[in-house]
Amino acid sequence: RGPEAAMPEKPVFEIVKDRYISMEDNVHLPLLYMTYPTVSLRHEDEAPLDVLSSILGGGKTSLLYKNLVKTQFAVQAQVGHPCAELSCTFSLLALPHPASGKSLADVEKIIRDTLVEFEQRGVEEDDLLKVKAEMEASFVFGLQSVSGKVSQLAANQTFSNNPNYIAQDIARYNNVTKEDVMRVFKKYIKDQHGVIMSVVPDGQLNSISAENNFVPGPRSAGGESSTSADELAVRKGTDSFDRSLIPPSGATEAVDIPEMWRRNFDNGISILGTQSLETPTTSLLLKISAGHYFNAKDKAGTAALLASMFGESTTERSAEEMSKALQKLGSSVTISAGNHYLNVN
């Protein structure tokens, strides 16, 4: 066992004025990326900031979607509040639509105007209902796979010294109030300074959002170690078996297959089902014989186009209304086209 490792200090960042930076890349569309330093993992303000990010840029009911994507000024716009081991950042990004004629500077102004709109609009009750349902659902759905269980247990043990921290995590988000969201908005985002990065296609530096006013310094990982291999005390493990011998093979492990049931109806519909009690969730998969193999030879891509259109407005609901209803349930519907089937999941 090595020496005990102390928890590192959580750094506190302060940016005294907006830092504009840019880079060229082998990309087709330009990108505007705005980020603000916030708090650390599981800080009391982390959950309200997560809720704020969802209100501003989470799905088709968000403000940025309304002001950028629905207006066809951008092909993508989103907001996130990711956390690493020691710190979190509040990030807003958008990719201008090439046919809109909007520059990165225009997109930045729309984003800043959206923040002003949010302050005037405030937090609505539906905002909290949607975000809290989505957050709880993401925790629960994350437990449906072995990797999801292991990841959550390991992360909770590492950062909270409690592998079963999921209940406290869900409670953190359920306890967020409208006042909490407005408080963190005014503390970390409103009138605060951040880093604004323009990523543009090669040779288009003239299209950046604003002139660069900051040059990042060289990154250093510290001085090189002068320790030689001869100075290291090697601890050799002791085996209780002979590694030169191939172990004998045992009996094949039986696979625990869930019990399935099937029902065939007179109209030709067949249902295959099973029950799992690991999580309180229900999953439905509808398979329709309308995949790529059913396309006419001169109309390749029709199935994929149909699948995409199913996610848009219907005669009874707009795309925003569908998204809002699903978010309040903590549910999702995905439609995709495979070779044989159109899949509704």
PLM features per residue range, with description:
Residues 46-47:
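Zinc-dependent metallopeptidase catalytic helix centered on the HExxH motif
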Residues 62:
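Conserved active-site loop region of the serine DD-peptidase/beta-lactamase
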Residues 54:
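Phosphate-interacting basic helix/loop segments used at nucleotide- and nucleic-acid interfaces
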Residues 1-24, 66, 167-287:
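Proteolytic maturation boundary segments
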Residues 29-40, 66-175, 195-200, 207-211, ...:
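M16 family metallopeptidases and their MPP-like homologs
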